[in-house]
Amino acid sequence: MRLFDFGRAPNPRRVRIFLAEKQVEIPRVTVNLFRREQLSPEFLAINPGGTVPVLELDDGTYLSECLAICQYLDAMHPEPALFGTTPRQQALTLMWANIVDNEGMSAIAEVLRNLSPGFRD
């Protein structure tokens, strides 16, 4: 596995925090957003959305989106169970994570995107 990452971006940071809590190390590939590497044909072939993080699985499958990546990692490395161990715990974790994404992180991401020279036309 490899994690396509950018150290200063908030979403990849969430995955790195998750990995640290799990005590799992995965090789990282830096995608420099300031240099617009996320818009290169090579990266768009990996993730047509042009966003990080992206987790490349050993079979060549690519996962994007923090929650999908973290849920996969939680299933592959079940201890500690950060998404919970029961269906109720897992559903509550996903519910609150989605609320944070939809009501908090999206607004912050738009501000950062509009302030960043790497995203200007």
Identify the residue ranges that each predicted region occupies.
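GST-like domain detector, emphasizing the conserved glutathione-binding G-site
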Residues: 1-121
